[in-house]
Amino acid sequence: MATKNEQVLEIRPIELETVTLKIVGDTPLIMHAWSEKAKREMLEKQMKVTKTKSRDAKNPVEDFIRSMYWLTDMPTDMTEEGFEKAIEQGARFGFPVTAFKQAAISASYRMGWSKDKMSLRGVFFIEGDENQMIEIHSDTPIMREDMVKVGMGTADIRYRGEFRNWWAELRITYNKNGQYSLEQIVNIINAGGFVCGVGEWRPERDGQFGSYHVAT
């Protein structure tokens, strides 16, 4: 009677390790969060809802306040005084954690360190809060006014929050037994800050804002 060949398989354990990296902004970070008003207008357009009223008057300070990702409660008083009061009460701001991972993945691919973008998605993870945000530390945000082109080349004025002298901490989890070492991952994240950046007018989008490096 023939016996079955037994094959011994070695299962390499996934040994996760979490480290904290500090990134420091090299150029100011410009935020442009989607406001509830913008989301509603987009939904109405997609649903072909007929609008009977005229376009609301632009409120620069409100646009500025709503352009930022608030970790604390956004002020209901959309005035300079309301914003200053929120700052005095310890307002905190964040940024989507996915932006930093996407910057790293894109930079690695652009520099020829990885054959494609898909292969890096499961190599490391960046921890965020319950809303997948990381806190941005900086000077008090300032309001910037920019002329932009929207739609069919129509000119518009945008008011957005600019963060100077900013920094953040990234909690990175990776597999110590994986294909990429911690040193390689750190270099990929560092390249992401130079090649791609985050936020509006970042290097990846023909700008020079939102660049950063890993502090040593």
Stretches with model-predicted labels:
Residues 1-216:
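RNA-interacting cores
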